[in-house]
Amino acid sequence: MNIVLASSSPSRLSILRSAGVEPLVCPADVDEDALLDSLVGRSPADKVAALAQAKAEAIAGDYPDDVVIGGDSMLLLDGALQGKPHTVDKTIERWKQQRGKTAELITGHCVITPRGRHVETSTTTVTFAHADDADIEAYARTGEPLQCAGAFTLEAIGGWFIDSITGDPSSVIGLSLPVVRRALYAAGYNVSEFWNNN
C-alpha cells in the first residue's frame, strides 16, 4: 500500500519525504476557479476543504488500494481568501497589502483510503513582517512565492518575512502531518506502515 499525493506541490512532497514517506505523485486536474464559483456563500474552511476533496476524488479511482491525499491551502486576509498570485506583479501587490498584518493560512485535507475518507482543515495564524518595498520586489522576482498560497513560503526565502506563526508549521508549508496522522489512525493504519524503511 502506498501514499499517493494528488498534488504537484514541491512543498507537500518535501513534507512527506522529510517525514519518511516516499509517495507516488499524481497531480489532480481540477478546475479550482469553477469549484470556488460554485461555493459562493460557504465558509473559507468549507471552500478549502472542498478543493482538497475534489483533488483526492479526481484520482482516487485509479488507486483503490492505496491512501490518496488531496490538499489545498489559501490565506484568509482581511476577510478575503487568497490563493496563488501566479505573477510577479500580483505577488508584489499582495505583499504590500499583507505586510505587518496577521492572517490565517487554511489548509484543507482529504485522505481517502480503502476503508473510508477523512476531510479536515487546519488553520494556522501567520504574522507577516513589515518588509520594505525593495525586499518585497526582490522576493517576488525570485519566483518562489508565485505558486504559493498567500504568496509566501515559510521554509525557504519567504521565512525572512514571517514574524511568527501560531499553530502547525507543516500546515503552513502545505500539509499537516497531525491531520494526516489522525486520518490514518481513524482508518486503522499506523503512520509507521508508510515509512520508507518498512
Curated annotation (Swiss-Prot):
Pfam families: Maf. Its cofactor is a divalent metal cation. The active site is at D72 (proton acceptor). It comes from the Bacteria. Gene3D superfamilies: 3.90.950.10. It catalyses: a ribonucleoside 5'-triphosphate + H2O = a ribonucleoside 5'-phosphate + diphosphate + H(+); a 2'-deoxyribonucleoside 5'-triphosphate + H2O = a 2'-deoxyribonucleoside 5'-phosphate + diphosphate + H(+). Coiled coil: none annotated. One of its GO terms (molecular function) is nucleoside triphosphate diphosphatase activity. One of its GO terms (biological process) is nucleotide metabolic process. Keywords: Cytoplasm, Hydrolase, Nucleotide metabolism. InterPro entries: ITPase-like_fam, Maf-like. Its EC number is 3.6.1.9. One of its GO terms (cellular component) is cytoplasm. Nucleoside triphosphate pyrophosphatase. May have a dual role in cell division arrest and in preventing the incorporation of modified nucleotides into cellular nucleic acids. PANTHER family: BIFUNCTIONAL DTTP/UTP PYROPHOSPHATASE/METHYLTRANSFERASE PROTEIN-RELATED, BIFUNCTIONAL DTTP_UTP PYROPHOSPHATASE_METHYLTRANSFERASE PROTEIN-RELATED. Belongs to the Maf family. This is Nucleoside triphosphate pyrophosphatase. It comes from Corynebacterium diphtheriae (strain ATCC 700971 / NCTC 13129 / Biotype gravis).
